[in-house]
């Protein structure tokens, strides 16, 4: 069946035919048949160099043979036991050894679960109710994350989705990423009531928005001053740029860290962790409840350990050089066409904005989304797949070769010409 035919069937089964909103785009999404290395093949026979990579987990590329082998071997032993297995210890030990601020952790099934439980834990430890999150920051699809700014910069947030009670929104204050004065004012007004600040160290769900020099250090200082906790959401950034969390590269010590994506090797996973003192509050050693039927399940643990074991032997500098080559090439193409743009990138992740600067969420909102979507459609026709949304992130994997980068730049040349 073709993608169009499959979508017509899917539209009768799922809202708008998809199981996650970002997968839908006009006129209909293509349906993937298989992925190998840096590429995906759709049911219509079209092959794409993939920079979406499952929205981030596949840093080793599609169908990595070592990860695939580990999954098959585990499947033959059992899919789920409801009891502990050795691989969860092996994966946790590897994460603990390479993460300065994680002495103890709890595996979950997604980044959404991880941040939800991290927020509950912070509230329990501090005895406080309020959470500060950043405008445009995404921490999963739970009620405490889906909050946007209220009518004023120092007011409580408002629900960004129907179904979230106003009472929930009244426990979340939305701050401005990269705006120290705004965060200072929030703490001056609510400081002794704030349980935690949660932020992505690099905002990856608003495109790619980098922290200004000193901003993350400022968050660490002001939370410590007021007895609040600092939560770094490293679901995207963890093990993305080196075999460590991003916080270790920046030498910043949050109280609680959440991770996901890469550490699962392509299978569902999440994690929240911190010092032993903090994590001992989680049940059954403490009274902060957290549980999950599939948490630490043997399939995800096997895939995660195999992926992390292989990743520990990789040279990240090669990956960064390829990303830089790609970004520089795209920048040159758009410059020669006199198209106003900026490319935000760090290490192995990047996004193209059609605006002259993007330093915060407000800037990202002003970028010309319609031009980005034209680029997305034109690139798809030329065999390159970027996320369809301006506010997602592109990733380069260890499976991407120099020839992939060259082919991508050639496709960009054609795509930009077709956009005229």
Curated annotation (Swiss-Prot):
Catalytic activity: (S)-4-amino-5-oxopentanoate = 5-aminolevulinate
Annotated keywords: Cytoplasm, Isomerase, Porphyrin biosynthesis, Pyridoxal phosphate
Transmembrane regions listed in the UniProt entry: none
Known pathway: Porphyrin-containing compound metabolism; protoporphyrin-IX biosynthesis; 5-aminolevulinate from L-glutamyl-tRNA(Glu): step 2/2
One Pfam family per UniProt: Aminotran_3
Name of the top EC class for this enzyme: isomerase
One BP term from GO: protoporphyrinogen IX biosynthetic process
Keyword field contains Isomerase: yes
Cofactors demanded by this protein: pyridoxal 5'-phosphate
Cellular component aspect of the GO annotation: cytoplasm
Cited InterPro entries: 4pyrrol_synth_GluAld_NH2Trfase, Aminotrans_3, Aminotrans_3_PPA_site, PyrdxlP-dep_Trfase, PyrdxlP-dep_Trfase_major, PyrdxlP-dep_Trfase_small
GO molecular function terms attached to this record: glutamate-1-semialdehyde 2,1-aminomutase activity; pyridoxal phosphate binding; transaminase activity
Modified residue annotations for N6-(pyridoxal phosphate)lysine: 261
Listed PROSITE patterns: AA_TRANSFER_CLASS_3
Record's subcellular location: Cytoplasm
EC number(s) stated in the UniProt entry for this protein: 5.4.3.8
Similarity comment text for this entry: Belongs to the class-III pyridoxal-phosphate-dependent aminotransferase family. HemL subfamily.
Protein name: Glutamate-1-semialdehyde 2,1-aminomutase
Gene name of the encoded protein: hemL
